[in-house]
Regions:
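Short, charge-rich binding segments
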Residues: 72, 87-91, 95-99, 109
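Gly/Pro-enriched, hydrophobic low-complexity segments
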Residues: 86-88, 157-158, 162-257
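N-terminal leader/targeting segments and the immediate start of mature chains
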Residues: 1-78, 115-117, 122-137, 141-150, ...
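Short, conserved active-site entrance elements at the starts or edges of catalytic domains
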Residues: 151-157
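Short, solvent-exposed coil/turn segments at beta-strand boundaries
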Residues: 45-49, 71-80, 97-104, 122, ...
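Short glycine/proline-enriched turns and hinge-like loops at secondary-structure junctions
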Residues: 63-65, 92, 97-98, 180-181, ...
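Beta-turn initiation residues at beta-strand->coil junctions
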Residues: 56, 83-86, 107-110, 219-223
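Short amphipathic beta-strand/extended segments with alternating polar/hydrophobic composition
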Residues: 93-100, 113-124, 229-232
Length: 258
């Protein structure tokens, strides 16, 4: 178990203008918490394309709610995230987020609303080496929608630094999730930005893919009761993607927001 803060989200290994994983692969044994975070930080550097499906189950006072999130990604810059209800008929309620690295397009089918906007520039100066580690952030090769499960799973550096490292972490050992070998980690009482979760009996467990460093499962409990279970049921690094994977035409009748 460790309570030492990890502040290496922004550490990058660069050679000839390219970034490389600082940790090429995990050893055969169990890593320490710090070693696991170092490995996770560079997850997206271990593949050129990615196909992933996440099923998220949220349990609250209003009952159970399940969401399906499909991700396609191609470095550098191209990403598509589709959020829907599992088993729903084609053309049902869904949301699409698509980026080519310069422009982000979104569409919400329920309200027939679309947007097309330039990617927001990140604040300047955050790469200043005089800044303490906790004040620096990971710069992704291919952006994903902020504060979403795809962002957390594929770009886990910020999650490790800003959430997991603020709690009491321990390695849980090897496990298999969706047919892939993973390392489990438990975090008790992590810092959160939402007051309902800022409790000493709030815990998180993650499963980290041994090959890529991607998070493939996230389980949250409060007071021993399950509140969220998100699992990557499909994970295909270096997947073959169709040429039209990142093409999108807004449906007829879309109202564009500016």
């Amino acid at each position: 178990m460790t309570t030492r803060l990890w502040d290496r989200a922004a550490v990058a290994v660069v050679a000839d203008g390219r970034r490389f994983p600082a940790v090429a692969a995990l050893g055969p044994g169990e890593p320490t918490v710090q070693e696991l975070f170092d490995f996770m930080r560079d997850a997206e550097l271990r593949f050129a394309t990615l196909r992933m499906r996440i099923l998220e189950r949220v349990i609250s006072t209003r009952g159970d709610d399940t969401t399906q999130i499909d991700v396609m990604l191609r470095h550098p810059g191209h990403a598509r995230v589709t959020t829907s209800r599992p088993g729903e008929e084609l053309g049902g309620t869904y949301e699409v987020w698509i980026s080519d690295g310069d422009i982000v397009r979104t569409y919400a089918a329920q309200h027939k609303l679309g947007t097309q906007r330039p990617i927001r520039n990140r604040p300047r100066g955050l790469d200043d080496k005089d800044f303490p580690g906790m004040s620096r952030i990971y710069e992704p090769i291919t952006g994903l929608p902020m504060e979403t499960l795809p962002e957390t799973f594929v770009h886990p550096a910020g999650f490790c630094q800003n959430v997991l490292a603020t709690g009491r972490c321990q390695i849980l050992g090897s496990r298999t999730v969706s047919g892939r070998s993973t390392i489990g980690l438990r975090c008790d009482h992590p810092r959160t930005v939402e007051l309902p979760g800022d409790r000493p009996d709030h815990s998180m467990e993650i499963s980290v893919d041994r090959d890529t460093g991607i998070i493939v499962r996230l389980v949250e409990t409060i007071g021993g009761s399950l509140t969220r279970d998100a699992v990557a049921t499909v994970l295909e690094p270096d997947a073959s993607l169709p040429p039209s994977a990142f093409d999108y035409t807004f449906p007829t009748g879309t109202t564009m927001l500016f």
